[in-house]
From Swiss-Prot:
PANTHER family: NADH DEHYDROGENASE. This is NADH-quinone oxidoreductase subunit N. Its EC number is 7.1.1.-. Pfam families: Proton_antipo_M.
Amino acid sequence: MTITPQNLIALLPLLIVGLTVVVVMLSIAWRRNHFLNATLSVIGLNAALVSLWFVGQAGAMDVTPLMRVDGFAMLYTGLVLLASLATCTFAYPWLEGYNDNKDEFYLLVLIAALGGILLANANHLASLFLGIELISLPLFGLVGYAFRQKRSLEASIKYTILSAAASSFLLFGMALVYAQSGDLSFVALGKNLGDGMLNEPLLLAGFGLMIVGLGFKLSLVPFHLWTPDVYQGAPAPVSTFLATASKIAIFGVVMRLFLYAPVGDSEAIRVVLAIIAFASIIFGNLMALSQTNIKRLLGYSSISHLGYLLVALIALQTGEMSMEAVGVYLAGYLFSSLGAFGVVSLMSSPYRGPDADSLFSYRGLFWHRPILAAVMTVMMLSLAGIPMTLGFIGKFYVLAVGVQTHLWWLVGAVVVGSAIGLYYYLRVAVSLYLHAPEQPGRDAPSNWQYSAGGIVVLISALLVLVLGVWPQPLISIVRLAMPLM
C-alpha cells in the first residue's frame, strides 16, 4: 500500500505527537531542563491540536487497514489532546518540588497521548489492542511516579497486575472472535454479524471476554475495584489523565466498534451491558457517599459516569441521537473533571509528600481562595448534572436517549443515581464555605490564577458555564463528528 500526501495529512496529529516524543527524549539525553522539556511537550500537543484543522480539510479516509480518519476520530483526538495538555500544565508546578527525575513525566504523558490518538482512529481490533497497550504502559510508570510514597507505589503495582490480566482477557476474546469470523476489521465484522452469525457461541464468548477487558479499562462494575485506590495513590496530575484521556479514548473506540459491528443487536450482550450499566450507576454513587478523600470520591463518581454513558451505548440503535449524547456527555465530563482534578493539583503543588486530597484540606477554602472555591463549586455542580452547567446538558441527552429506546429501568437508575450523586457533590461544595480550621493544612499558591494550570482550570470553569447555558456550538461540533459509514 502506498502512502499519499493526503494520508500523511490525515495522520498529522499522530505524527506530530510522535515527533514531540523523539524531540523530548533527545532533549532529556542532551541536558535535563524541566522548563524546556515541559515547554516542548506543550508546544507539541498544541501543534497537534492545530493540525486537526488541516485534517478536517483533507476529509474522511481510510489510512492503512488499521485506521480510519473522519470527523469522529477528530473529535476524540481533540478531547484526548486537551486532556494531555491539561495534564502537562498541572504537572509542571507539582513537579517543581519533586526531587527525583522530573522530565520523564512529560515523555510518558506524550506516549500515552499517542495511544489515545491511535484509539480514536482505530478501525480494526489490532489497532484497538495496540492503542490500549500504548495508553496503559506509560500509565504504569505515571501512577507510581511519586514512588517514595508507599501509596503511589502500591497503586502502580495494583494497576499493572490487574491491567495485564484485563489485557489477556481482551486478547483472548479477540482470538475467539477471529476464530469464528475470520476477520478483525470493524467493517468486516459488521458484515459477518449481519449474516446471522451473532448467535454463534464462540463469537458470544469472544465478545464476552472483550467486555471484561474493556470493562476493566473503563472501570465498570464489577471490574472497577482498582479505581479508587489508583486514583488516590497516583499523583493528582496523573489522576486527571486517568479520569479523562484514557476513559474518553477507550470509550470512543468501543463506540466505533458498536457502530460498525452491531454487537448490541444480540439480546444476550444487551442484557449483560444493561446489568453492568445499572450496577455501575448505583454502586458507583453509593460507594462515593461515604468517602472523605476527594480523589477516591471522584474515582467512584467516574464509575457512575461511565455507567451513564453505557446507557447511550446500549441505545445505539437510535443512531445519531445516541452518538450526539455520548459526544456532548464526554465533553462535559472532560471539562468538569479537568477543573476538579486541576483544583486538587493546584492545592497539592509543589510536591510535598501526599496530595491535598482529604475533604478537610478544602474546608473553608472560600475564605482565603474565593475564586478557586467558586471553580470547585461549579465543577461539583456540573458533575452532579445541575441545570445551567454542561453536565446537565449531557445527562439530559442520556435520559432522552434512554426514554426514546424505552430503557425504562436504566432511565430510573440514571435518575436515582443522579439524586444520590447530588448529596456527595454538594457535601464537597458546602465544605468549601464552612469556617476555615485554625491551622489550614495545604493551600494553593497565592498567584495560582497566573500559572498555566490556573488558567486551564479557569477556562474549564468558563466553558462548563457558557456551554451549559448555550450548548449549541458544542452540539454543532459533535454533529460534524458523526462517522460517515
